[in-house]
């Protein structure tokens, strides 16, 4: 099963059941962003997690098995995103990527922020001038090793 067909199958099942990613988070105990990443072929479910989702969404055996495969992460096309919301993240990194890198290295030293030992939370912040999106990323700092 391709990532595109897996995503289409999962999204159709979620829609048919009238569920949101927040509903799935509550039902299986995994964060809604992580569940969404699973739907887009960017995460791997354990057998138990895949079976819970299969029960909730009435998934067949092939789809349930595909949820447990190890994905090729970060393989979304095209390289420069064209979806307006996703492009904003690309634009944010174009504008703030180097400044963030410098500030992080001033605080922690030479290294990177893990996207493996990592969480991301999305919240809605009510504002009279227009609601705001609040995204909090929390990744373990990994210093570069000298040898």
UniProtKB/Swiss-Prot annotation:
Superkingdom of the organism of origin: Bacteria
Catalysis performed (reactions): cyanate + hydrogencarbonate + 3 H(+) = NH4(+) + 2 CO2
Active site residues according to the UniProt entry: 88, 91, 114
Transmembrane feature ranges: none
InterPro entries (UniProt xref): Cro/C1-type_HTH, Cyanase, Cyanate_lyase_C, Cyanate_lyase_C_sf, CYNS_N, Lambda_DNA-bd_dom_sf
Keyword Lyase: yes
UniProt keywords, alphabetically: Lyase
EC number: 4.2.1.104
UniProt record similarity statement: Belongs to the cyanase family.
Protein name: Cyanate hydratase
Organism: Parasynechococcus marenigrum (strain WH8102)
Gene: cynS
């Amino acid at each position: 099963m391709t990532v595109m067909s897996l995503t289409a199958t999962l999204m159709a099942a979620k829609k048919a059941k009238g569920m949101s990613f927040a509903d799935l988070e509550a039902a299986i105990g995994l964060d809604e962003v992580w569940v969404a990443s699973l739907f887009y072929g960017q995460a791997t479910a354990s057998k138990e997690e895949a079976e819970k989702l299969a029960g909730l969404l009435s998934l067949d055996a092939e789809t349930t098995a595909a949820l447990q495969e190890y994905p090729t992460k970060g393989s979304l096309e095209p390289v420069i995103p064209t979806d307006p919301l996703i492009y904003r993240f690309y634009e944010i990194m174009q504008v703030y990527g180097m400044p963030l890198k410098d500030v992080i290295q001033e605080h922690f030293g030479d290294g990177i922020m893990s996207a493996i030992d990592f969480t991301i939370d999305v919240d809605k912040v009510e504002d009279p001038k227009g609601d705001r999106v609040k995204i909090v990323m929390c990744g373990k700092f990994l210093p570069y090793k000298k040898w």
